[in-house]
């Protein structure tokens, strides 16, 4: 799904926000540091400025095959090119009878619209000649619509909101700032000045697509996410994070902007100008979820600096009129002999709780909820939530994976549901944006893995199927 050098395609899809499993004999000790070669690499060489497309003057509508007044007609020849929207990532659907579809194929198709950074509303008329079960993702696999069942010949209209970002931003003094991207982020769909939609599932199909910039009077709140690889938009299967599943649980009216990145600590998130970009654009009425711990615990004597930076994040966000919310870090897949989760995070979740108390900030205790959930799953059941795969399970997975920190789609989805439960349980102000049709999740009663399904996003090029060094997963 991304255009990355072969060396980084899968190695940095993981990027090890923390090593897999700390020794159960010393639950307070941080896990061993990953091999030096597996650590995140900041991109070097000449910095190429992002080419920003012209702003949309208003709503733009695309229709499949059938001409419609005021709309752009899509054909198989409508390919993404420069500032022109079109089919992307070497996929082209079948277009017939006013419907764009992948009938009879298990492969998704992608459509991209070059746009400047900002928030956008997307409206889709979904459904085709055949009965469909459609999943829609945006950008780097952000889950938007999940297994939407549509009858044969029927059409269902769905609306959702998407954030688009680029590395460049304007500082408060008017000078130009730029996020220091890691090598794995170069070419990533989350940084490329276009809005990309993935149509997946069984017989995915749509009839019309409308995109509208949410500016001026139509501007709406944004939920900014700051964190590490357990929150990032993981762009390559089978990795996933709770941050990229979260948009599925919100109604139109709020946009999730996931600035989390693999390998980040509070210190590096600050130093790489990631927080600077957020604080340059966050506005009154916005929200800010922050979760760090897995990498911070690797910093020698890092706790005082962690507390200082996290407190400063809260102070700066609040000064801009936005609402900060602290999220404690989820546990690893580390059980003791009695079936209880080991504490492998060296006191950082408790530090997060104390910061929330000291600053009178909302708290989502994902650490506590994940402990309850993983223990309810049991050791064998919890394996289904983490990156535990046999060789050959996915393209490029040439060796067994035994990663006890990072999640697959199922684990990430369950954790995202824990987040929504935490919002509701503490009646946080962002609760009003949750989809009321989504049940209130109970961490003590997690979903059954065998009943869970999200369609697989295939790699777009050979570089996404490189061998994963086993040393990176221990």
Model-assigned labels for residue ranges:
Residues 22-237, 397:
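Compositionally biased, intrinsically disordered or flexible polar/acidic segments
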Residues 265-274:
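Structural motif
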Residues 87, 239-252:
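Short catalytic helix/loop segments, enriched in acidic residues and glycine
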Residues 252-265:
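A short beta-strand-loop structural module common to alpha/beta enzyme folds
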Residues 6-16:
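Bacterial N-terminal signal peptides
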Residues 139, 273-436, 440, 444, ...:
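Alpha-helical cap/lid subdomain in secreted, periplasmic
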Residues 1-5:
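Positively charged n-region of N-terminal signal peptides that target proteins for export
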